[in-house]
């Protein structure tokens, strides 16, 4: 009787990534929109918005292309006339209102970009819209970063660095009328950029007063802590950017991030038996062959539990957690409260 070799979560995950086609470049995606009849500038902007936010305000478009109110208004009217954009809020007498929010929803655009089911196309709460506008503002200011716009591209990046999906923030969704479950990664849907040496994570959360914002920032950091530890274990640097609407918010969040900045603590010494267990789990995870764990540790589940006890013991002995190498702040002046009401 032949025994079927079991596959670990990482092995299955890697196989899926490798089987997938290489995602198109930004230039290739923009070319797909030009094929629909959009001009170079229109295709460039629509590609940026669809990939990174789904929403924009006129002043963001003006800043990127250094254009005035008139050309911007004509551009927005073209998008609305084509049925691919909705603009929230009434235009004032000048036919221009910088606080209006444009939502790019046209299915044909997202389909051409290969992201037809992207959530940016759907309506969202005001909280989510503001978060997307803030994070998009940073992306616009830093086009030189190697942005990873979609979930598959982010996952593939971490996989290339040898990082297990188990440490990537994730959530399982269950359908209302089916037993089928869907696992989604990086559900905060905030920008990430990486070049293999350093990885940048953008945080934007404008909801509530100072105390609530501080609590939500801490929650976001903890959700990413295992991923950041894995990056640093591989000698990668973690850079966090917090995007805010005021300088006061930026200062408050910088103070919080400072508590997590610093070198990772030295590794705690392991006994020979503990190291053998961790090595055996790493080997099983990379090969998909769990039989050695059956023979020596009573199976994969007991081995995983023992490994968790080892890691928890080591973590408790390391002192205050340090997850990031650097941080910075970005005040989105185009989105400050006196420009765009909360």
Regions found by a protein language model. Give the residues of each.
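Glycine-rich, often proline-containing surface loops adjacent to acidic residues and nearby aromatics
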Residues: 55-56, 109-121, 195-204
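Basic, Lys/Arg-rich alpha-helical nucleic-acid-recognition elements, primarily the DNA-binding modules
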Residues: 1-109
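Hydrophobic, Leu/Ile/Phe/Ala-enriched alpha-helical segments that form helix-helix packing faces
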Residues: 49, 76-83, 138-146, 221-232, ...
């Amino acid at each position: 009787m032949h025994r079927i070799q079991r596959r670990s979560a990482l092995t299955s995950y890697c196989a899926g990534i490798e089987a997938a086609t290489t995602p198109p470049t930004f230039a290739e995606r923009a070319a797909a929109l030009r094929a629909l009849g959009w001009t170079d500038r229109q295709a460039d902007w629509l590609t940026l918005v669809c990939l990174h936010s789904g929403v924009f305000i006129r002043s963001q478009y003006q800043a990127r292309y250094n254009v005035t109110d008139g050309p911007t208004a004509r551009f927005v009217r073209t998008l609305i006339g084509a049925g691919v954009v909705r603009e929230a809020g009434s235009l004032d007498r000048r036919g221009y209102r910088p606080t209006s929010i444009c939502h790019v929803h046209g299915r044909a655009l997202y389909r051409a970009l290969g992201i037809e089911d992207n959530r940016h196309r759907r309506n969202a709460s005001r909280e989510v819209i503001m978060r997307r506008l803030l994070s998009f503002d940073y992306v616009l200011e830093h086009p030189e970063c190697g942005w990873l716009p979609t979930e598959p591209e982010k996952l593939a990046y971490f996989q290339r660095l040898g990082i297990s999906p188990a440490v990537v923030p994730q959530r399982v969704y269950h359908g209302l009328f089916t037993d089928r479950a869907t696992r989604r990664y990086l559900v905060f849907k905030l920008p990430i950029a990486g070049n293999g040496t350093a990885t940048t994570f953008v945080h934007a959360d404008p909801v509530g007063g100072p105390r609530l914002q501080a609590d939500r920032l801490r929650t976001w950091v903890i959700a990413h802590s295992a991923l950041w530890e894995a990056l640093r274990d591989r000698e990668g640097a973690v850079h966090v950017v917090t995007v805010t609407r005021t300088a006061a918010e930026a200062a408050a969040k910088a103070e919080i991030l400072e508590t997590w900045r610093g070198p990772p603590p030295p590794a705690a010494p392991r006994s020979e038996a503990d190291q053998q267990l961790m090595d055996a789990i790493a080997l099983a995870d990379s090969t998909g062959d769990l039989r050695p764990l059956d023979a020596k540790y009573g199976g994969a589940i007991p081995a995983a539990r023992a490994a968790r006890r080892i890691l928890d013991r080591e973590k408790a002995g390391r002192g205050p957690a340090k997850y990031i190498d650097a941080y910075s702040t970005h005040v989105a002046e185009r989105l400050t409260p006196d420009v765009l009401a909360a």
